[in-house]
A protein has these predicted regions:
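Conserved AMP-binding/adenylation subdomain of ANL enzymes
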Residues: 208-227, 234-335, 345
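Conserved AMP-binding/adenylate-forming core of the ANL superfamily
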Residues: 26-58, 62-75, 79, 96-101, ...
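ANL superfamily adenylate-forming
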Residues: 120-181, 288-337
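Conserved AMP-binding A3 loop
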Residues: 37-41, 185-211
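Conserved AMP-binding/adenylate-forming
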Residues: 274, 314, 330-456, 462-465, ...
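Conserved pre-ATP/AMP-binding loop-to-beta segment of ANL
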Residues: 25, 157-158, 165-189, 196, ...
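AMP-binding/adenylate-forming catalytic core of the ANL superfamily
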Residues: 112, 408, 418, 423-424, ...
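AMP-dependent adenylate-forming
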Residues: 12-39, 545
């Protein structure tokens, strides 16, 4: 299959599903209350049946809002919308009623697909007010909410499972040849770390272009049918693209029940490959590290050898005969056991959605969990570059994908050009023109390109850089990573724009909530590794975690600096 020759993501799906065994399981939800599985054949039929209804209720180019947790029906809905000539607008389930109102008023969907009662409650008021919404398809029974609707509004609602019971006629089995590589596939709203989200319009060709690079990365990782465990929100561009990579490689896909059950789900699914964001690896690093540090005697020596030799191998440093022998021993006694905790079949983690700390990257790779750091943003469909398994450089985000042009502007900003670049921001022509100049997308990230092998390195986010009172540029991300790598500290945010020194908001780990002296000692230890300008002079401990629920983190677990600063402005200013 040559991805460059395909016109649409729909063409990709039908090409792959026609090749697969129709009875082979393709999609499976690991929810004990809803044991849902779809074979390749059932998935194809379900997409065609759902599309039959959608086509009657939308025109070509109409937007369709999709609000659901990760589950097989998410996949089916997304493909059915595109097959019908619609544009999928995925939305996070963590949004508030106001967030949904903003999205609906901005993209004006003709159709809404929503998962359950809980999510529909947040949408129903806006749905009832908007005449442009023709139909609402519910994945689960939602009688509780519908009981309060008048008869006119009740007619808007259709049940997903009922729609799948309709008969397919020969003319319903079509593949929509009108779609082109330049056709919009989806509008993904950037969660953003401040301000209203912007709708990023991505094309079929942009995502297909991304898949060429993704398949190159995955090719050396497996020689049989790969298994994926999907747990990051499918409404995020990162996991949304992974969904199409799963089609391209003919994978078996498991959907995690929920984040709290992730480790159990990993044991059950035994994934070959997993995608995650830096916060996941940081939590993993702290948990594994705490357990490793408890070991004494011979076990402690084995762990030390695992980390030391793993790092040597990662850096392609020469090993003596005795080191090679010891490395084989720790492979069996240490790395194999760690790998078993992740199902035993894991070939690689792929990290994206933010910068992965170098120390964590080295640690993960050294203990036998290969971790490939990539880089991208919603506006680039989303991947720009990724480390290949045969040559990992943890301090970088790897070489650019085929078809992506990358250059560094005079001020250090990373610029990207290629088919993967978005078509633009929905309804925001001026905003689009500000970031795409002469075909080059201005990413807002600061970086450099390694002259030796063309690997890209991200040094900071342009808008996050702190400029001190003396005009010096300081990277908060570097300092924050060093602080949160310590087991005593769960989260932090560094502050100090236009100030004489830096301060930090610290959320201690639960075992250290009342241990201010120990936290101070940790900061003192870190300060010894920092330059005079980077040192943290004062700290403020807070008990409440930054979370998606309290609006202080994005759905991919990045701290919303603007919101945190607004909430804790007085405490921060009192540190000066």
């Amino acid at each position: 299959m040559n991805l460059d020759n395909l016109n649409s993501l729909i063409e990709l799906f039908f090409y792959q599903s026609d090749k697969q065994n129709k009875k082979s399981i393709f999609l499976q939800w690991l929810n004990p209350n809803k044991q849902i599985t779809y074979t390749w054949g059932e998935t194809q039929k379900s997409i065609l049946k759902l599309s039959k209804t959608i086509k009657k209720n939308i025109k070509e180019g109409d937007r369709c809002l999709l609000v659901s947790e990760n589950r097989p029906e998410w996949f089916i809905s997304d493909l059915a919308i595109m097959l019908s000539g619609g544009i999928t607008v995925p939305a996070y389930t963590t949004y508030t009623e106001e967030d949904y109102k903003y999205l609906i008023e901005d993209c004006e969907p003709s159709l809404v697909i929503v998962s359950n009662n809980e999510m529909l409650r947040k949408l129903s008021n806006t749905i009832n007010q908007k005449n442009f919404i023709k139909k609402v398809i519910t994945l689960d029974e939602v009688n509780k909410v519908l009981d309060n609707q008048d008869s006119v509004n009740k007619e808007k609602y259709l049940d997903f499972n009922t729609l799948l019971k309709i008969d397919l006629l020969e003319e319903d089995k079509f593949q929509n040849n009108k779609l082109k590589r330049t056709s919009p596939a989806c509008i993904i709203y950037t969660s953003g770390t401040g301000g209203n989200p912007k709708g990023v319009v991505l094309s079929h060709g942009g995502i297909l272009n991304n898949l060429v690079g993704a398949c190159e990365i995955m090719k050396p990782l497996f020689n049989s049918r790969p298994v994926f465990l999907t747990w990051l929100p499918l409404s995020h561009s990162y996991e949304h693209c992974v969904q199409f990579a799963q089609i391209a490689v003919g994978a078996k896909v498991f959907y995690a029940e929920k984040i709290e059950k992730l480790l159990e789900n990993i044991s059950e699914a035994k994934p070959t490959i997993m995608t995650a964001v830096p916060r996941f690896y940081q939590n993993l690093y702290n948990k594994i590290n705490i357990n490793l540090k408890k070991q004494t005697g011979f076990k402690a020596k084995l762990i030390d050898a695992t980390l030391r030799l793993g790092k040597k191998k990662l850096l392609n440093q020469k090993m003596s005969f005795s080191e090679k022998l010891l490395n084989l021993i720790v492979n069996q006694l240490v790395r194999k056991k760690i790998k078993k905790q992740f199902g035993g079949n894991l070939k690689a983690f792929v990290s994206g959605g933010g910068a992965l700390d170098k120390e964590i990257g080295e640690f993960m790779n050294s203990i036998g969990l290969p971790t490939l750091q990539g880089y991208g943003l919603t506006e680039t469909s989303p991947v720009v570059s990724c480390n290949p398994i045969h040559k990992i450089k943890v301090e970088t985000v790897g070489p650019p994908f085929k078809g992506n042009q990358v250059k560094i502007a005079e001020d250090g900003e990373i610029l990207v050009k290629g088919e993967n670049v978005m078509l633009g921001y929905w309804n925001k022509k001026e905003e689009t023109q500000k970031v795409i100049i002469d075909g080059w997308l201005h990413t807002g990230d600061i970086g450099e390109i390694d002259s030796e092998d063309g690997y890209l390195k991200i040094t900071d986010r342009k808008k996050d850089i702190i400029i001190s009172a003396g005009g010096d540029n300081i990277s908060p991300a570097k300092i924050e990573n060093m602080i949160t790598n310590e087991p005593e500290i769960d989260q932090c945010m560094v502050y100090g724009d236009k100030k004489n020194y830096l301060v930090a908001l610290i959320v201690p780990s639960k075992d250290f909530l009342k241990e201010k002296e120990k936290i101070n000692n940790v900061i003192e230890k870190i300060n010894k590794k920092l330059t005079l300008l980077e040192k943290i002079k004062r700290i403020q401990l807070i008990k409440e975690n930054f979370s998606i629920e309290n609006g202080l983190m994005t759905p991919t677990m990045k701290v919303k600096r603007k919101k945190v600063t607004e909430k804790y402005k007085d405490q921060l200013e009192n540190l000066y």
